[in-house]
Amino acid sequence: MSPQTETKASVGFKAGVKEYKLTYYTPEYQTKDTDILAAFRVTPQPGVPPEEAGAAVAAESSTGTWTTVWTDGLTSLDRYKGRCYRIERVVGEKDQYIAYVAYPLDLFEEGSVTNMFTSIVGNVFGFKALRALRLEDLRIPPAYVKTFQGPPHGIQVERDKLNKYGRPLLGCTIKPKLGLSAKNYGRAVYECLRGGLDFTKDDENVNSQPFMRWRDRFLFCAEALYKAQAETGEIKGHYLNATAGTCEEMIKRAVFARELGVPIVMHDYLTGGFTANTSLAHYCRDNGLLLHIHRAMHAVIDRQKNHGIHFRVLAKALRMSGGDHIHSGTVVGKLEGERDITLGFVDLLRDDFVEQDRSRGIYFTQDWVSLPGVLPVASGGIHVWHMPALTEIFGDDSVLQFGGGTLGHPWGNAPGAVANRVALEACVQARNEGRDLAQEGNEIIREACKWSPELAAACEVWKEIVFNFAAVDVLDK
């Protein structure tokens, strides 16, 4: 036996493979205020006990590997390892369990969503012992929250910048999303803003294509914005999409937007990546720009109930990384979004403190310790008949965004914007007078139609448009 081997043996090293649960399943563990807590939906392979599956998740997302290694003796596993501290069966589902895992804070780099996700949702999602794995929720401890800047400005600062209070903000995505020239694009922006919208928006896949280069689009949109402001006396904005192939190019576009004096830029945070998003959020705070976030690609990650990452986790990650708005679903429109689940993560975006509430899918109490809030954006298949429900569901601190529901108006873009603004003002006034938007919404809209021909025309066009499909991601019974 060599001296090196003797040394390893003398400190208790024993080569081989042992069950994860012997080291990483610790039901007696008392979680600490500084731990990051995770709730995983685990579907083990046949024959794999839930305790072993939960322990495998804790191990493979922290300090463990598939075999014992002698370098374990050079550090303190008890200090750094993840621990599966509770497992509960999912009622109504065969062979599904919620495994709760606690991670010591020292495992993660300060201020880095990228590093946090690389550990927690890294290679473990391809682990053969698991048929499926989904991250349902995270508890981010205040000690870690305080290492993040978060949103560039937040809800109250945005309202102060725009001088708009007491109602949801109104937006519109310019359509068709691809193919317009920069000048025609700017014309559509002007008409929508002149008609009464607060914002217009680049679609998520508008970057810098041959039919419309980014610099031309920025210039024509800025011209439209300033012209609409001069005519209406209101502050207007257009979400200029700064997403690009490199971080350097993205920041260059944001710099040009700042030089034009516009109030807001945009980023596709999942396709662009968390490192790029955090970099842009820091630039926006330093330079007075609001930051609108689109969640393109989210459904690839979050839509399947038994595998992936729930959007409430992606929403928390965005609040940490930085963004002033983020698309959150509509409940009533064309995109996925069950009401209780949606309102659960909307509260996680906006509120300072959110209590655990399993009836809304919230597994952990979350204290954001004064991290600025994010405005949820309802967008996708909505029109004037949805306005009462949207106002009632999302409240004042939200952005209601009508793309086709503005540009599809039979009289044009500006009348479409007028229709939406009138519908919103009618709903807000009715709510403030004590009327029930959920019960009287259609009546409120019909009353407003009597003095707004633009709204009456919109109501006639979309009176039979509904999207009656069951949500895929629903709460456990």
Swiss-Prot record:
<comment type="function">
    <text>RuBisCO catalyzes two reactions: the carboxylation of D-ribulose 1,5-bisphosphate, the primary event in carbon dioxide fixation, as well as the oxidative fragmentation of the pentose substrate in the photorespiration process. Both reactions occur simultaneously and in competition at the same active site.</text>
</comment>
<dbReference type="InterPro" id="IPR036376">
    <property type="entry name" value="RuBisCO_lsu_C_sf"/>
</dbReference>
<dbReference type="GO" id="GO:0009507">
    <property type="term" value="C:chloroplast"/>
</dbReference>
<feature type="binding site">
    <location>
        <position position="204"/>
    </location>
    <ligand>
        <name>Mg(2+)</name>
    </ligand>
</feature>
<keyword id="KW-0602">Photosynthesis</keyword>
<dbReference type="InterPro" id="IPR020878">
    <property type="entry name" value="RuBisCo_large_chain_AS"/>
</dbReference>
<dbReference type="GO" id="GO:0009853">
    <property type="term" value="P:photorespiration"/>
</dbReference>
<dbReference type="Pfam" id="PF02788">
    <property type="entry name" value="RuBisCO_large_N"/>
</dbReference>
<keyword id="KW-0601">Photorespiration</keyword>
<feature type="binding site">
    <location>
        <position position="203"/>
    </location>
    <ligand>
        <name>Mg(2+)</name>
    </ligand>
</feature>
<feature type="binding site">
    <location>
        <position position="379"/>
    </location>
    <ligand>
        <name>substrate</name>
    </ligand>
</feature>
<dbReference type="InterPro" id="IPR017443">
    <property type="entry name" value="RuBisCO_lsu_fd_N"/>
</dbReference>
<feature type="binding site">
    <location>
        <position position="295"/>
    </location>
    <ligand>
        <name>substrate</name>
    </ligand>
</feature>
<keyword id="KW-0113">Calvin cycle</keyword>
<dbReference type="InterPro" id="IPR000685">
    <property type="entry name" value="RuBisCO_lsu_C"/>
</dbReference>
<keyword id="KW-0456">Lyase</keyword>
<feature type="modified residue" description="N6,N6,N6-trimethyllysine">
    <location>
        <position position="14"/>
    </location>
</feature>
<feature type="modified residue" description="N6-carboxylysine">
    <location>
        <position position="201"/>
    </location>
</feature>
<keyword id="KW-0934">Plastid</keyword>
<keyword id="KW-1015">Disulfide bond</keyword>
<dbReference type="GO" id="GO:0019253">
    <property type="term" value="P:reductive pentose-phosphate cycle"/>
</dbReference>
<feature type="active site" description="Proton acceptor">
    <location>
        <position position="294"/>
    </location>
</feature>
<dbReference type="InterPro" id="IPR033966">
    <property type="entry name" value="RuBisCO"/>
</dbReference>
<dbReference type="InterPro" id="IPR020888">
    <property type="entry name" value="RuBisCO_lsuI"/>
</dbReference>
<keyword id="KW-0488">Methylation</keyword>
<keyword id="KW-0460">Magnesium</keyword>
<keyword id="KW-0150">Chloroplast</keyword>
<feature type="binding site">
    <location>
        <position position="177"/>
    </location>
    <ligand>
        <name>substrate</name>
    </ligand>
</feature>
<feature type="binding site">
    <location>
        <position position="173"/>
    </location>
    <ligand>
        <name>substrate</name>
    </ligand>
</feature>
<dbReference type="InterPro" id="IPR036422">
    <property type="entry name" value="RuBisCO_lsu_N_sf"/>
</dbReference>
<comment type="subunit">
    <text>Heterohexadecamer of 8 large chains and 8 small chains; disulfide-linked. The disulfide link is formed within the large subunit homodimers.</text>
</comment>
<comment type="similarity">
    <text>Belongs to the RuBisCO large chain family. Type I subfamily.</text>
</comment>
<feature type="binding site">
    <location>
        <position position="327"/>
    </location>
    <ligand>
        <name>substrate</name>
    </ligand>
</feature>
<keyword id="KW-0503">Monooxygenase</keyword>
<keyword id="KW-0560">Oxidoreductase</keyword>
<dbReference type="Pfam" id="PF00016">
    <property type="entry name" value="RuBisCO_large"/>
</dbReference>
<keyword id="KW-0007">Acetylation</keyword>
<feature type="binding site" description="via carbamate group">
    <location>
        <position position="201"/>
    </location>
    <ligand>
        <name>Mg(2+)</name>
    </ligand>
</feature>
<keyword id="KW-0479">Metal-binding</keyword>
<feature type="binding site" description="in homodimeric partner">
    <location>
        <position position="123"/>
    </location>
    <ligand>
        <name>substrate</name>
    </ligand>
</feature>
<keyword id="KW-0120">Carbon dioxide fixation</keyword>
<feature type="site" description="Transition state stabilizer">
    <location>
        <position position="334"/>
    </location>
</feature>
